[in-house]
Amino acid sequence: MNPLRKKRLIIILAILVGVGAAVGLALSALQQNINLFYTPTQIANGEAPQDTRIRAGGMVEKGSLQRSTDSLDVKFVVTDFNKSVTITYRGILPDLFREGQGIVALGKLNADGVVVADEVLAKHDEKYMPPEVTKALKDSGQSAPTPAKEG
């Protein structure tokens, strides 16, 4: 093999190794940051993985919110009107968090079927519904509830 061909082959191999390493790093970073969305029905049916960060969303059941008297721990139930799942959270809930409205919780599913959330997202206003929650409600044959009029 002449020296010019050998040099080209080394350059091509170096480029392939570099591209392979870049793709590998990108896939690794994406895999760590992807949080798949699961409905309460999917979680109750065992479709959601345990001890893996997921997003769980639905409507907060009325009367299900329980606040700890001595800490920031809260517990509530989220439903898609077919099945429900309990979510626990330690922290301050968003100002827009209310029973009967849509939320998305990010956390891990434990062995008891409870989502231990480290982040809770509430809808922006009375008409907004997270797209995943809207789709889940539509798939279950329900429509998003209309907001209660205040005043």
From Swiss-Prot:
Residue sites binding heme per the record: 124, 128
Subcellular location: Cell inner membrane
Keywords, sorted A to Z: Cell inner membrane, Cell membrane, Cytochrome c-type biogenesis, Heme, Iron, Membrane, Metal-binding, Signal-anchor, Transmembrane, Transmembrane helix
Highest taxon listed in the record's lineage: Bacteria
Membrane topology classification: Single-pass type II membrane protein
InterPro entries: CcmE (IPR004329), CcmE-like_sf (IPR036127), NA-bd_OB-fold (IPR012340)
GO cellular component, as recorded: plasma membrane
Location, primary (coarse class): membrane
Function: Heme chaperone required for the biogenesis of c-type cytochromes. Transiently binds heme delivered by CcmC and transfers the heme to apo-cytochromes in a process facilitated by CcmF and CcmH.
Protein name, per record: Cytochrome c-type biogenesis protein CcmE 1
UniProt source species: Pseudomonas fluorescens (strain Pf0-1)
